[in-house]
């Protein structure tokens, strides 16, 4: 996933030279103080940000140098959950979910009817009510926005998932729902998952390899499935 990778904003190092290997079907949870760069690290691993130096690879491909369609053709289907939802403000909840399917419609051989069916199915599984399907994100609560974002992340049947603070700001029923989905991903040997969170209930419930990001270094906090090394590790 990371080969001698670094990331910096000017003189501020978020990640110093690091090698990180997460095996196929493996899971990693990254903690760290607020402001340390957990979200940046997550987006770096997902290929949404380019490394300052070194390489980020998913299934042997550098995602920020590869088109989304080429990634899918080479066996990389990414699902990303942003901490605030990350939905497009001018699209309804339903259209936010259908967007990814429409982008890859030719690749997957999907027509409009199948695209809408899959999107509605994903939203319904996440307990988004039909009354919210056509609402813009600004008219949805944080909990609903996160559920819509999670539906968008799931609808392409991803084999790489990246979740930023997935349970932050959620009520208890929504949190329980999200935990169940995370556990399903964790237990699926086809899916590689990286989560950034400081949530103690989530950390305890997930029970996966946990690293702490501190001053640009990844420090091991448990060794259930060790697969990371860096100068401070």
Task: List PLM regions with ranges.
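Helix-to-loop junction immediately C-terminal to a conserved catalytic motif
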Residues: 46
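ABC ATPase NBD coupling module
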Residues: 63-79
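Q-loop/switch helix immediately C-terminal to the Walker
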Residues: 91-106
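Conserved ABC ATPase "signature" region
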Residues: 113-131
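Conserved ABC ATPase signature
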Residues: 136-140
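Hydrophobic anchor residue at the start of the ABC signature
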Residues: 150
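Catalytic Walker B motif of ABC-type/P-loop ATPase nucleotide-binding domains
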Residues: 161-164
